[in-house]
């Protein structure tokens, strides 16, 4: 048997699925349950141990973020002003900026994106740097 007791619901938008029957079973069996969502659907209280919201505001600027609290707010940085998140960030314990990685761009341009994001984080210490590791490794 596999001893892992952590389950992360992610991929596409997990909150569009009826996760609660399987989540209840897993919770009764002692699993730690997490979700990574774009925040457009509110997460019901009480069943999940960790909520990560990763808005897709740079791709869909007119879509409302309904989940306004959680453990982690994770934003891909493409040069947007951080004030964009002022009304959202106070509801989260951890704030992360990720440099935008684009497989169509050169290594140099992606490196510049990383350096710019790193500077923004250095100048805004409430935010921490995070990487889309799977993209940097070519596991898309």
What are these regions (language model features)?
Residues 1-9:
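Glycine/small-residue-rich loop that forms an oxyanion/phosphate-binding "nest" at active or ligand-binding sites
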């Amino acid at each position: 048997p596999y001893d892992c007791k952590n389950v992360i619901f992610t991929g596409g938008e997990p909150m569009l699925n009826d996760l609660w029957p399987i989540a209840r079973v897993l919770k009764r069996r002692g699993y730690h349950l997490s979700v990574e969502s774009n925040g457009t659907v509110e997460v019901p209280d009480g069943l999940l141990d960790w909520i990560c919201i990763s808005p897709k505001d740079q791709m869909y600027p007119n879509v409302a973020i309904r989940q306004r609290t959680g453990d982690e707010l994770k934003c891909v940085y493409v040069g947007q002003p951080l004030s964009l998140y002022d009304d959202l960030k106070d509801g989260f314990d951890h704030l992360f900026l990720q440099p935008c990685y684009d497989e169509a761009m050169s290594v140099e341009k992606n490196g510049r994106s990383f350096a710019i994001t790193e500077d923004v984080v250095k100048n805004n210490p409430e935010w921490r740097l995070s990487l889309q590791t799977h993209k940097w490794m070519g596991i898309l």
